[in-house]
């Protein structure tokens, strides 16, 4: 929301890395410039995470191509819109606990590995 920008900027300035989740949708892409502006103004590293992606949808590639214009890294892969995420929440668990060997947990572990590697490269 527009009124959240001041708080988001304060939080970003105190961060080492800001992840910008982007769903493959026109609404999310319309919000990207404001998010990039917050990251740039905070002088902090930022990266896009494709999230809530429909399985194998062509929009994923189109969204990735649109994000490349902003010059921030795009986390490899994506977080797919899987039932395991919703089911895990109803049990009060993270998807890595709920279905540890499932595809959703694999995607989250891959995201965490990328974050960890990025932070270690300061």
Where do the protein language model's features map onto the residues?
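Switch II (G3) loop of P-loop NTPases
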Residues: 1-11, 22-23
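Short, basic/glycine-rich phosphate-binding loops at helix/coil junctions
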Residues: 13-17, 89-92
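Anionic-ligand binding region
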Residues: 14-54, 58-68, 79
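Beta-strand-loop-alpha "switch" segments that mediate conformational coupling across diverse proteins
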Residues: 54, 64-93
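C-terminal boundary of histidine-terminating zinc-finger modules
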Residues: 89-110
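Short, hydrophobic alpha-helical segments
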Residues: 112-122
């Amino acid at each position: 929301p527009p009124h959240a920008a001041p708080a988001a900027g304060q939080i970003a300035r105190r961060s080492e890395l800001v992840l910008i989740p982007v769903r493959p949708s026109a609404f999310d892409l319309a919000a990207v410039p404001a998010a990039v502006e917050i990251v740039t103004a905070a002088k902090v590293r930022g990266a896009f995470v494709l999230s809530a992606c429909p399985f194998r949808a062509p929009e994923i590639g189109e969204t990735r191509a649109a994000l490349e214009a902003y010059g921030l890294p795009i986390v490899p892969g994506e977080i797919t819109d899987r039932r395991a995420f919703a089911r895990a929440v109803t049990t009060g668990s993270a998807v890595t606990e709920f279905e540890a060997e499932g595809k959703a947990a694999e995607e989250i572990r891959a995201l965490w590995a990328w974050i960890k590697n990025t932070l270690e490269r300061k």
